[in-house]
Curated annotation (Swiss-Prot):
Stretches that traverse the bilayer: 5-27, 434-459
Effect recorded for N122Q: Loss of glycosylation site. No effect on normal location in lysosomes
Annotated phenotype, changing A162D: Abolishes interaction with GBA1. No effect on normal location in lysosomes
Purpose: Acts as a lysosomal receptor for glucosylceramidase (GBA1) targeting.
Biological source species: Mus musculus
Protein's name in the database: Lysosome membrane protein 2
GO molecular function: cargo receptor activity; cholesterol binding; enzyme binding; phosphatidylcholine binding; phosphatidylserine binding; protein homodimerization activity; protein-folding chaperone binding; scavenger receptor activity
Gene Ontology CC annotations of this record: endocytic vesicle membrane; lysosomal lumen; lysosomal membrane; plasma membrane
Resulting phenotype, N105Q: Loss of glycosylation site. No effect on normal location in lysosomes
Keywords, ordered alphabetically: Disulfide bond, Glycoprotein, Lipoprotein, Lysosome, Membrane, Palmitate, Receptor, Transmembrane, Transmembrane helix
Membrane topology: Multi-pass membrane protein
Subunit-structure text: Interacts with GBA1.
Glycosylation sites: N45, N68, N105, N122, N206, N224, N249, N304, N325, N412, N430
Disulfide bond recorded as keyword: yes
């Protein structure tokens, strides 16, 4: 009986160890999990993945911070602007996909993303309908720039004088965000109908969408999950001067493909920035007990490099690192994008304004992604809207102002997975961990039986060393 147990333990130990090593080397269970995820992460009507894509369950908030101008007269005399940050004014962002249509072969799906904003008073510093902000007159600057390029110059000069337009204006937060009717724009609209009579930093963005997208469903390849192939009927942009800069790359930022490697560079197309951007791995994170890869927008995105030369408008007219001229896609308004407080921009932009305090924690854009599922656990998209201003001798409204990139406001669009969704995701991840750890469980059993085998071997040797008195007696006695 003892000898039988001895051989059984040894055989089981060897068999289990060989099996576990074979399973680990062949990655049998890991491949099974990966294939299951790849198969399920497809945009198919009626699935959980599709429902989450159509109506994202995670709460999204957008915070607006304005820069109130405290020394307007001094600025017109050539002094440095002194700005005071006012905010946040927080809104809940409600989003859903609509007008959904699948392609004939199931590999594509078209949709628009509707967005609406609901004010959150308890997360804000004041009432946007009451609070006043003094800021630079972007409609005036837009019209002045228009006058440089058209035959309407004399007419525009006359209108500015007649209506006594000022370079700095006061409006409520609500007006600056969602729009108001501007006197000068209304007059220009009569002669140039493509110029809207209304102005707002997010005018016609509440309760609307940014156009139709065509996405890949991931049916043919999981790496293509929710990847954009068309936007507003175009497979590429036409604003920039090179084919590379005009490419529409990646997803819309709401989702990413599963099974992400930290060595990957991920791409996304935020239409409000008028270009595609890439994000790179930064660190390992833990969000609500879930593992995550933190990806960040690198400084090179807005760097003054040869790779970004195609974003210089007009061609060859490149600005210093940290800012992007997007006036070409904003109906000619002299809008310059940057990170908040000119974070990661050239020092010249920071020092030109009193009140800029860039720091990583508050002004960096990032996204924390669960690498197994590609689900976003936490994220913050932060960028600043500025305008380009300079002295123009023919327009007295500009006074003796310095040439500069003038901050208007910045936003922080953030998302954080809720506990209920996190617990559901934990259940999925824990199940996959159990499956992928089966080889280690088998190995542990092999080690256990190996120890039993060793113990039985030692016990058997001890039994041979210790016998009865008769067994130890010599066979031949004298």
């Amino acid at each position: 009986m003892g000898r039988c147990c001895f051989y059984t333990a040894g055989t089981l130990s060897l068999l289990l160890l060989v099996t576990s090593v074979t399973l680990l080397v062949a990655r049998v269970f890991q491949k099974a999990v990966d294939q299951t995820i790849e198969k399920n992460m497809v945009l198919q009507n009626g699935t959980k993945v599709f429902n989450s894509w159509e109506k994202p369950p995670l709460p999204v908030y957008i915070q607006f911070y304005f820069f109130n101008v405290t020394n307007p007269e001094e600025i017109l005399q050539g002094e440095i602007p002194l700005l005071e940050e006012v905010g946040p004014y927080t809104y809940r962002e409600l989003r859903n996909k609509a007008n959904i249509q699948f392609g004939e072969n199931g590999t594509t799906i078209s949709a628009v993303t509707n967005k609406a904003y609901v004010f959150e008073r308890n997360q804000s510093v004041g009432d946007p309908n009451v609070d006043l902000i003094r800021t630079i007159n972007i409609p005036l600057l837009t019209v002045v720039d228009l006058a440089q390029l058209t035959l309407l110059r004399e007419l525009i000069e006359a209108m500015l004088k007649a209506y006594q337009q000022k370079l700095f204006v006061i409006h409520t937060v609500h007006e600056l965000l969602w729009g108001y009717k501007d006197e000068i724009l209304s007059l220009v609209h009569i002669f140039k109908p493509d110029v809207s009579p209304n102005f707002g930093l997010f005018y016609e963005r509440n309760g609307t969408n940014d156009g139709e997208y065509v996405f890949l469903t991931g049916e043919d390849n999981y790496l293509n999950f929710s990847k954009i192939v068309e936007w507003n009927g175009k497979t590429s942009l036409d604003w920039w001067t090179t084919d590379t800069c005009n490419m529409i790359n990646g997803t819309d930022g709401d989702s990413f493909h599963p099974l992400i490697s930290k060595d990957e560079v991920l791409y996304l197309f935020p239409s409000d920035l008028c270009r595609s951007v890439h994000i790179t791995f930064s660190s390992f994170e833990n969000v609500e007990g879930l593992p995550a890869f933190r990806y960040k927008v690198p400084a090179e995105i807005l760097a003054n490099t040869s790779e970004n030369a195609g974003f210089c408008i007009p061609e060859g007219n490149c600005m210093d690192s940290g800012v992007l001229n997007i006036s070409i896609c904003k109906n000619g308004a002299p809008i310059i994008m940057s990170f908040p407080h000119f974070y990661q921009a050239d020092e010249k932009f920071v020092s030109a304004i009193k009140g800029m305090h860039p720091n990583k924690e508050e002004h960096e854009s990032f996204v924390d992604i669960n690498p197994l599922t590609g689900i976003i656990l936490r994220g913050a998209k932060r960028f600043q809207i500025n305008t380009y201003v300079r002295k123009l001798d023919d327009f007295v409204e500009t006074g003796d102002i310095r040439t500069m990139v003038f901050p208007v406001m910045y936003l922080n669009e953030s998302v954080l997975i809720d506990k209920e969704t996190a617990n559901q995701l934990k259940s999925v991840i824990n199940t996959t961990l159990v499956v992928t750890n089966i080889p280690y469980i088998i190995m542990a059993l092999g080690v256990f039986f190996g120890l039993v085998f060793t113990w039985l071997a030692c016990r058997g040797q001890g039994s041979m060393d210790e016998g009865t008195a008769d067994e130890r007696a010599p066979l031949i006695r004298t």
